[in-house]
């Protein structure tokens, strides 16, 4: 068997086993002690469950995606020196097109508007 095929088979098998085990493990029932915040033995001064802006979270996720895009496209000049630079450029264009379509979708859904 090919080395890549073996690695892919091991990865898929390990993922399936771990996913199956996680579904079979019992869920622990939360009680008041587990749900209360712990602050080094002292009573909490305020609420530990602060409200979090979902808009901020979405903007942060978009930032991470486009930061990853830059990391993926940085080695592009070295990819031009390969035997098939057209294939490298095609993959880069596909990544850019996919991210652009995602950005357009997020924009049309109103995810980039901070205040309503």
Curated annotation (Swiss-Prot):
GO molecular function: NADH dehydrogenase (ubiquinone) activity
EC code: 7.1.1.2
Annotated transmembrane regions: 3-23, 56-76, 85-105
InterPro entries in the record: NADH_UbQ/plastoQ_OxRdtase_su3, NDAH_ubi_oxred_su3_sf
Catalytic activity: a ubiquinone + NADH + 5 H(+)(in) = a ubiquinol + NAD(+) + 4 H(+)(out)
Keyword Electron transport: yes
Subcellular location: Mitochondrion membrane
Its membrane topology: Multi-pass membrane protein
Pfam families: Oxidored_q4
Keywords, alphabetical: Electron transport, Membrane, Mitochondrion, NAD, Respiratory chain, Translocase, Transmembrane, Transmembrane helix, Transport, Ubiquinone
Cellular component annotations (GO), alphabetically ordered: mitochondrial membrane; NADH dehydrogenase complex
The family this protein is said to belong to: Belongs to the complex I subunit 3 family.
Task performed by this protein: Core subunit of the mitochondrial membrane respiratory chain NADH dehydrogenase (Complex I) that is believed to belong to the minimal assembly required for catalysis. Complex I functions in the transfer of electrons from NADH to the respiratory chain. The immediate electron acceptor for the enzyme is believed to be ubiquinone.
Full protein name: NADH-ubiquinone oxidoreductase chain 3
Gene name in the database record: MT-ND3
């Amino acid at each position: 068997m090919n080395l890549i095929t073996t690695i892919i088979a091991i990865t898929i098998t390990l993922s399936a086993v771990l996913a199956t085990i996680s579904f079979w493990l019992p869920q622990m029932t939360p009680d008041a002690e587990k749900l209360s915040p712990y602050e080094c033995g002292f009573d909490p001064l305020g609420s530990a469950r602060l409200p979090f802006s979902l808009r901020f979270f979405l903007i942060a996720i978009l930032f991470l995606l486009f930061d990853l895009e830059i990391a993926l496209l940085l080695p592009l000049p070295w990819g031009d020196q390969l035997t098939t630079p057209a294939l490298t450029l095609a993959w880069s264009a596909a990544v850019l097109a996919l991210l652009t379509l995602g950005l357009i979708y997020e924009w049309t859904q109103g995810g980039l508007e901070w205040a309503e």
